[in-house]
Amino acid sequence: MFFLINKLVMNFDAPSPWGIYFQDSATPQMEGLNELHDNIMYYLVVILFAVGWILLSIVINYVSTKSPISHKYLNHGTLIELIWTITPAVILILIAFPSFKLLYLMDEVSDPSMSVLAEGHQWYWSYQYPDFLDSNDQFIEFDSYIVPESDLDEGGLRMLEVDNRVVLPELTHVRFIITAGDVIHSFAAPALGIKCDAYPGRLNQVSVFINREGVFYGQCSEICGILHSSMPIVIESVSLEKFLIWLKEQ
């Protein structure tokens, strides 16, 4: 039982077979996306049952040609026309305002403590830490390739593990600068609420604030060629002390 619980907890930050919901949130923006999704689902469920009830009532009560009120209320009802015009408009407004607010907040890039440059290639990712230097006084940079299934360690995730992970400190404002070296790619990490297109010759940026330690998996989300599925993204969030140790090892 303990093994199963630990296995489930580990897989919450990665795609799982037959998954029907989001991965566990690890950033404020992903928590906001979860909340927005749940709120919209509430409206959709209410609409589904309301429309279903109305249709069923019409079929049962007004389909008969003997009904003296069917034409009066269904073909010439000003009140009902106002209701089915105003009600959807109000619902759309209730959905739109939280959506616009979240969209604006996700587009804002707070004053970052550090930046990471992510560059997509066919078919791997390159990363650079422009705020830190290695032992040769060069920017810390490395390439990240998928680990073949034959080389996976025990417990490794197929098509998701890489040879070099992006290591970030938790509780730190980080800016990802995203670009591409050949064709269009997309940098996506669902648990972090990140999805940003990578264009050759153009820099896009997205802010992330990881609020817990963990290993978070993502993939290129733009079809970029025959090995598009072989461009996983692995971001490891560690404590600041562990991050400083990792920097010294580079």
Curated annotation (Swiss-Prot):
InterPro entries the record matches: CcO_II (IPR045187), CcO_II-like_C (IPR002429), CcO_II_C (IPR034210), Copper_CuA (IPR001505), Cupredoxin (IPR008972), Cyt_c_oxidase_su2 (IPR014222), Cyt_c_oxidase_su2_TM_dom (IPR011759), Cyt_c_oxidase_su2_TM_sf (IPR036257)
Cofactor(s) needed for function: Cu cation
Pfam family, one: COX2_TM
Binding locations of Mg(2+): 222
One cellular component (GO) term of this entry: mitochondrial inner membrane
Domain of life: Eukaryota
Location of the protein in the cell: Mitochondrion inner membrane
Topology of the protein relative to the lipid bilayer: Multi-pass membrane protein
Protein task: Component of the cytochrome c oxidase, the last enzyme in the mitochondrial electron transport chain which drives oxidative phosphorylation. The respiratory chain contains 3 multisubunit complexes succinate dehydrogenase (complex II, CII), ubiquinol-cytochrome c oxidoreductase (cytochrome b-c1 complex, complex III, CIII) and cytochrome c oxidase (complex IV, CIV), that cooperate to transfer electrons derived from NADH and succinate to molecular oxygen, creating an electrochemical gradient over the inner membrane that drives transmembrane transport and the ATP synthase.
Protein name (database record): Cytochrome c oxidase subunit 2
Species the sequence originates in: Podospora anserina (strain S / ATCC MYA-4624 / DSM 980 / FGSC 10383) (Pleurage anserina)
Name of the encoding gene: COII
